[in-house]
């Protein structure tokens, strides 16, 4: 009976813990461009050229970019910098040691960030959209930005 009471008390706390884990920051609504192939291709180009230098997407293969209308030749010519094969995973050449030295922490893998950040406050896309829009210029930081 004692064990049952403890179990019920613990279960009663679950909703409160869930609400506390949500945070309280309001999310902006990301524009839905999931059917706009040119926007998706531009996003892939920006990600590979800027984000993939530090952040891996180790659960995604380059050949998945064909799903947004890119040909294998376009992928090879414009988006493959750390690999020779379109079937390879999107990994970075930055070592964990260098990342910790330069940034203070290893940049997170972004393979499933949109799924992981979905919450009752909004979709994972809303989270990423809000996150990227909150960067600002900060001359006091080594990178010049607040990230």
Residue ranges: model-predicted function:
Residues 56-64, 119-122, 140-141:
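Short, solvent-exposed secondary-structure capping/transition elements
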Residues 60, 116, 134:
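Short loop/turn segments at secondary-structure transitions that flank enzyme active sites
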Residues 1-34:
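Post-cleavage N-terminal segment of exported redox proteins
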Residues 45-57, 96, 106-115, 127-130:
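C-type cytochrome heme c attachment motif
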Residues 124-147:
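Extracytoplasmic/lumenal ectodomains and periplasmic regions of secretory and membrane proteins
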Residues 21-45, 56-67, 75:
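Electrostatic cytochrome c docking/interface patches
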Residues 65-108, 113:
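Structured domain cores in non-transmembrane regions
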Residues 33-40, 44, 100-103, 118-125:
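Solvent-exposed, acidic/flexible segments
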């Amino acid at each position: 009976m004692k064990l049952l009471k403890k179990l019920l008390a613990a279960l009663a706390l679950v909703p409160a813990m869930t609400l506390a884990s949500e945070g309280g920051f309001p999310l902006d609504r990301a524009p839905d461009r999931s059917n706009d192939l040119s926007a998706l291709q531009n996003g892939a180009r920006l990600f590979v050229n800027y984000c993939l230098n530090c952040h891996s997407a180790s659960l995604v293969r380059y050949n998945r970019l064909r799903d947004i209308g890119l040909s294998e030749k376009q992928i090879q010519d414009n988006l493959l910098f750390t690999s020779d094969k379109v079937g390879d995973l999107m990994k970075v050449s930055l070592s964990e040691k260098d990342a910790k030295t330069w940034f203070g922490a290893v940049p997170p893998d972004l393979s499933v960030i949109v799924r992981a950040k979905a919450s009752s406050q909004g979709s994972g896309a809303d989270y990423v959209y809000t996150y990227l829009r909150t960067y600002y210029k900060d001359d006091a930081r080594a990178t010049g930005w607040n990230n």
